[in-house]
Amino acid sequence: MTLFSSISSISNPMTSSKSSISSFGSGTSMGSNTVACGGGCGGSGGILGLGLGLGLGLDLTGGSRSRGACGGNGGNRGNGNGGMGGGNGPCCGGCCCGI
């Protein structure tokens, strides 16, 4: 699997404004609480919520939510859960294309 990312303009994580995020695979996540469905499963979140289709759920802002290959919800904990792991993700076993 080939993943590529292009990081756009990023707002200050300490502010409430959330700007463009990043694009992964064929999906793009733009703005606050938007879903990117690229690279298997996307991520939803704030300033730099990353969702990679490799079972990774990364939350770099502490306020965004990101979902990996099988659910997980970072919320304000600053942690996204990927892989076959838990969290509060609404879907497991398919592409997470919704909040």
Curated annotation (Swiss-Prot):
- Give the highest taxon in the source lineage: Eukaryota
Q: Which residues form a coiled coil?
A: none
Q: Which GO terms describe its biological process?
A: sorocarp development
Region Disordered: list its residue ranges: 1-29
Q: Which Pfam families match?
A: Coiled
| Record-stated family | Belongs to the hssA/B family.
Q: What is this protein called?
A: HssA/B-like protein 41
